[in-house]
A protein has these predicted regions:
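Broad hydrophobic/π-residue packing in well-ordered secondary structure
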Residues: 8, 21, 43, 54-55
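Charge-rich, low-complexity amphipathic helices
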Residues: 1, 36, 45-47, 79
Length: 106
């Protein structure tokens, strides 16, 4: 297994390459770590490889907030600097600067 360099960091605001949602990264898996049922539910034309980083997001779209699990290949930087309006933001992060949220320093 080779060492992978993450394209994104915890706290980065990102958007999905194919679907209309954005979010902030709060955790990362170094390879696919979800159910096969979830994986097969992704349309084949955008189904990601399993051998890459997957990010946990506090996500939002125009209608709802939710948690998302997205492969690195399907994420782009969101340069809008607009805050994420997810209700769990303040439980995980203590502030925001530009397009990045930061965790509290202990």
């Amino acid at each position: 297994m080779s060492i992978q360099k993450a394209k994104f960091s915890i706290g980065d605001i990102v958007k999905h390459k194919h679907f209309d949602f954005r979010g902030v990264i709060y955790d990362v898996d170094f390879e696919f770590n979800n159910s096969e049922e979830w994986y097969q539910s992704i349309p084949k034309n955008v189904r990601p490889r399993k051998d890459q980083l997957f990010y946990h997001l506090l996500a939002e779209n125009e209608e709802v907030t939710y948690e998302a699990y997205v492969s690195e290949q399907n994420l782009l930087v969101d340069e809008s600097e607009e805050p994420i309006k997810h209700p769990l933001i303040n439980e995980i992060f203590s502030g925001k600067k530009g397009s990045t949220y930061f965790k509290p320093s202990n």
